[in-house]
């Protein structure tokens, strides 16, 4: 199973116009979805931001977060812990992205998530975030959806 960025992962827990595509991608996989330990915190923020923006119904954020967190606790999702190996890979990723021509202006959290994926030797990335996808391509990951 590919590494799931939060931009795609959230579609498994709240209904969005393209959620079915991501649910099917997860369903077809032979292994568990893999996420970063940091995704746990980002997911809470993303869900509340969507609720605030009225992209999801009121009182949905906490319910969706509980479902997600239960999946983390029950090992439905494979968790990559944050550690020194991820931090060192992050440093390398920042250099690669900002030395590339054209530059890929990666954000800190995206770099940490990509470092988690690469440290865990994940060859594939599921993301809807354009910067994350660009950085993933630069780093040699296969990007889904294509």
Regions found by a protein language model. Give the residues of each.
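A generic local structural motif
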Residues: 19-21, 66, 111-114
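Short, well-structured N-terminal submotif of metal-dependent ribonuclease cores
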Residues: 1-63, 130, 139-144
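Generic secondary-structure boundary/loop-capping signal
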Residues: 7, 35, 74-76, 103
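A short, N-terminal amphipathic alpha-helix
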Residues: 25-29, 70-71, 119
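Poly-acidic low-complexity segments
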Residues: 5, 72, 82-85, 129, ...
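Active-site-proximal, substrate-binding regions of enzyme catalytic domains
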Residues: 38-98, 138
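Short flexible/disordered coil segments
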Residues: 2-8, 93-104, 135-146
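Active-site neighborhoods of divalent-metal-dependent phosphate/nucleic-acid chemistry enzymes
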Residues: 77-130, 134
């Amino acid at each position: 199973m590919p590494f799931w960025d939060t931009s795609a992962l959230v579609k498994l827990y709240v209904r969005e116009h393209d959620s079915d595509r991501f649910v099917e991608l997860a369903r077809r996989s032979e292994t568990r979805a893999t996420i970063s330990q940091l995704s746990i915190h980002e997911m809470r923020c993303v869900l509340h931001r969507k609720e605030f923006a009225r992209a999801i119904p009121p009182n949905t954020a906490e319910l969706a977060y509980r479902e997600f967190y239960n999946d983390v606790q029950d090992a439905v999702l494979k968790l990559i812990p944050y550690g020194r190996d991820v931090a060192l890979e992050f440093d390398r990723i920042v250099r690669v992205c900002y030395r590339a021509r054209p530059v890929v202006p990666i954000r800190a959290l995206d770099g940490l998530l990509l470092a988690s994926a690469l440290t865990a030797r994940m060859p594939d990335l599921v993301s809807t975030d354009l910067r994350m996808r660009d950085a993933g391509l630069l780093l040699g990951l296969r990007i889904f959806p294509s």
